[in-house]
Amino acid sequence: MADLLAGAGIFDVDVDDAVADEHVRSSAYRRVVLVTASSRSRGRDRAIVAAILRDPIEMVSKSAVVALVDRIAMKVTGPAEFRQWSAELLPEIDQLKAERHREFIHRRVHDWLFYLSIEDGHMPTPVELAKVTDWMQRVLAEESTSLAVLALLDESGSRKKIRNIAKNRAGSRKLRAQ
């Protein structure tokens, strides 16, 4: 824990408190993730993920790793860069004992690859859309500026709420003017 915090330049966390209290540790991990994601270099990411994943409470470590995945996905230049970055982390992620935690992170990576491919110009099919989580469908319904993607979500979204968000956004004057 001390090395992880020092490597991120975080010196105001009591290491003994962090070791003893999962809430303090979780907060420290969030700060480490913020520093790590804001760095231009991705060279230390795998080691940082490995250190976080050694936490005795997998839910705490999984949450921190998912936060890093989310932040990096929003920084990369496209799906190829994210695919390469995430592939480097998968051996560490696959060390998680709980299969549900491993699967959750793998699904999140898949979701972001789907999102980034759309941002890169790919128009998904209903079958491809069905393979992403409700969470990602909602992100797309709320953020996509593509009328074609919104129409797909309106027709094939997995939940009524997703379909309604997409339908309402597709009909907004602001979006149609773009």
Mark where each language-model region is:
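Alpha-helical scaffold segments
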Residues: 1-178
